[in-house]
């Protein structure tokens, strides 16, 4: 949380100077602060559904910020690609959460970890959680959205997209090792 907060502060200060000549700054800063709130929420929650909500907040705000310069058609295309992939990933994450809550009637990561039985549905939920989060953090081979998004977004947005990607990586590791740690250690 401290690293994300300090990064957010630095990027916001940088964006004050970098974006000062642009129009529509109210929308830019509203989306930037939504992105910051989404990232801070993702790293601080211990609940799968709240993690999903914060992931979606950061995804939608990130897509809007990538397409912020609407006069650049490539930026709009990159923002649309980012939004489409984030939406497909969100559908998979929501399906995984539905599978887990349907089996165990719990959303808290610690409670789920104590109840997990590593059934076939649990393994399916693992895949449905891991793949979208790996895509969101830009892991190979699901990193195809990053070149367009990083090159067309304003530099302050690109910096914060990297922070957002690292928050998704943290969420991926937290879910993998908290929920599926015993299953992953058994496989080795």
Residue ranges of model-derived segments:
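Hydrophobic alpha-helical transmembrane segments in multi-pass integral membrane proteins
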Residues: 1-40, 171
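Hydrophobic cores of alpha-helical transmembrane segments in multi-pass inner/ER membrane proteins
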Residues: 2-9, 97, 126-133
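Alpha-helical transmembrane segments of multi-pass inner-membrane proteins
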Residues: 3, 81-86, 127, 161
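C-terminal ends of transmembrane helices
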Residues: 9-21, 64-78, 136-151
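Transmembrane helix-loop junctions and nearby membrane-interface residues
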Residues: 9-12, 16-19, 44-47, 97-104, ...
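Alpha-helical transmembrane segments of multipass membrane proteins
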Residues: 13, 37-41, 64-65, 98-99, ...
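Alpha-helical multi-pass transmembrane bundles of energy-transducing inner-membrane proteins
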Residues: 27-124, 135
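Short helix-boundary/re-entrant hairpin motifs in multi-pass inner-membrane proteins
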Residues: 78, 124-187
């Amino acid at each position: 949380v401290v690293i994300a907060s300090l990064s957010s502060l630095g990027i916001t200060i940088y964006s004050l100077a970098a974006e000062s000549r642009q129009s529509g700054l109210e929308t830019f800063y509203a989306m930037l602060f939504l992105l910051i709130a989404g990232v801070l929420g993702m790293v601080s929650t211990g609940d799968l559904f709240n993690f999903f909500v914060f992931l979606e907040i950061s995804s939608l705000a990130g897509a809007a910020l990538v397409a912020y310069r609407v006069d650049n058609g490539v930026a709009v295309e990159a923002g649309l690609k980012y939004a489409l992939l984030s939406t497909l990933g969100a559908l998979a994450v929501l399906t995984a959460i539905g599978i887990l809550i349907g089996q165990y009637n719990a959303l808290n990561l610690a409670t789920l970890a104590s109840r997990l039985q590593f059934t076939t549905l649990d393994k399916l939920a693992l895949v449905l959680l891991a793949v979208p989060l790996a895509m969101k953090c830009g892991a190979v081979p699901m990193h195809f959205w990053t070149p367009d998004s990083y090159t067309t977004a304003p530099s302050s947005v690109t910096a914060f997209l990297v922070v957002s990607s690292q928050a998704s990586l943290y969420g991926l590791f937290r879910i993998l090792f908290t929920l599926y740690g015993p299953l992953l250690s058994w496989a080795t």
